[in-house]
């Protein structure tokens, strides 16, 4: 497995992988890998001849009061895990490589990026869209894999790829992979390591409360009071605050007051012990 931090070397190495018609899948990450990331790698390996994983802690998607400096960085450990999974190449650029002096461009995806996490983290999805677009242009993958845990991020990336007429990857080849969960149902996240044992135990109420709310909505309960009950359950369990608990259209993320004959998601962001957790689940049978 190669680990590369120069763009010219990346392009040469990817071209070599493509010799003979081999397909290339990209799995973008910020490192601090866990089983959720490795599941993305395995899905990619099952669909492409070669897997390229990127590791880059992207400063432009962190706000001024967020955890950029504290975000875990463990390149050697991450690379060992990726090599064990058969990854062909790790693209680990420096900040200077991605954003050289004079860098002045940004991609903003309106609409789908503006509510939910976008409302609480202004500029976050501009940073996500910009860095992912750069990664797509750098690697030119045939397909790319993202976790469904960050559902809004996945939606933003798909709209960006559609609107910019990207062909590598085409929007249809941007694949979402089901959220990987701990034994108690909590969605795997690099930020879970910030939780104290007490807060980690309390956090397990999040997926349980979401499933209860989904069951109620699917059985005809009114959406607004059901979501209010969900928020109350989280606060009672020890969460500090709930940023949002929303039923939304799965594609455009517009809030829904009732289930319709199209895919929907329940999306929640809540804070416990200073750590912000997000989760989402499908709602309805469509």
From Swiss-Prot:
Q: Would the keyword Transcription regulation be found if you checked this record's keyword annotation? A: no
Q: Where does beta-alanine bind?
A: 61
User: Keyword Ligase, does the record have it?
Assistant: yes
In the record, the note on similarity to other proteins reads: Belongs to the pantothenate synthetase family.
Q: Which residues form the signal peptide?
A: none
What protein does this entry describe? Pantothenate synthetase
The subcellular localization recorded is: Cytoplasm
Specify the superkingdom. Bacteria
Organism of origin is Erythrobacter litoralis (strain HTCC2594)
Q: Which terms does the UniProt entry file under GO BP?
A: pantothenate biosynthetic process
Q: Which GO terms describe its cellular component?
A: cytosol
- Binding positions for (R)-pantoate? 61, 153
Q: How does it assemble?
A: Homodimer.
List other remarks. The reaction proceeds by a bi uni uni bi ping pong mechanism.
State the protein's purpose.
Answer: Catalyzes the condensation of pantoate with beta-alanine in an ATP-dependent reaction via a pantoyl-adenylate intermediate.
Primary localization? cytoplasm
Q: Where is the active site?
A: 37
What gene does the UniProt entry assign to this protein? panC
């Amino acid at each position: 497995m190669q680990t590369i931090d120069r763009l010219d070397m990346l392009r040469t190495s990817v071209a070599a992988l493509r010799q003979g018609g081999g397909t290339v899948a990209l799995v973008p990450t910020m490192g601090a890998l866990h089983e959720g990331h490795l599941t993305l790698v395995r899905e990619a390996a099952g669909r492409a001849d070669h897997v390229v994983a990127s590791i880059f802690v992207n400063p432009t998607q962190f706000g001024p009061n967020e955890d950029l400096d504290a975000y875990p960085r463990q390149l050697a450990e991450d690379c060992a895990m990726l090599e064990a999974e058969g990854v062909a190449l790790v693209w680990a650029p420096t900040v200077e490589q991605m954003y050289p002096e004079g860098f002045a461009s940004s991609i903003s995806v309106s609409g789908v990026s503006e509510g939910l996490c976008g409302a609480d983290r202004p500029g976050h999805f501009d940073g996500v869209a910009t860095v992912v677009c750069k990664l797509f242009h750098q690697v030119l993958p045939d397909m790319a894999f993202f976790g469904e845990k960050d559902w809004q991020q996945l939606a933003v990336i798909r709209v960006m790829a559609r609107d910019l007429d990207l062909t590598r990857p085409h929007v249809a080849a941007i694949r979402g992979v089901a959220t990987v969960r701990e034994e108690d149902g909590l969605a795997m996240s690099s930020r879970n390591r910030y939780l104290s044992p007490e807060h980690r135990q309390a956090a397990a109420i999040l997926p349980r409360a979401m499933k209860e709310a989904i069951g109620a909505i699917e059985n005809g309960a009114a959406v607004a009071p059901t979501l209010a009950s969900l928020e109350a359950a989280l606060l009672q369990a020890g969460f500090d605050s709930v940023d949002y608990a929303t039923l939304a259209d799965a594609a455009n993320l517009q809030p829904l007051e009732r289930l319709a004959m199209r895919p929907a998601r329940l999306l929640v962001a809540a804070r416990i012990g200073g750590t912000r957790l997000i989760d989402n689940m499908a709602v309805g049978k469509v």
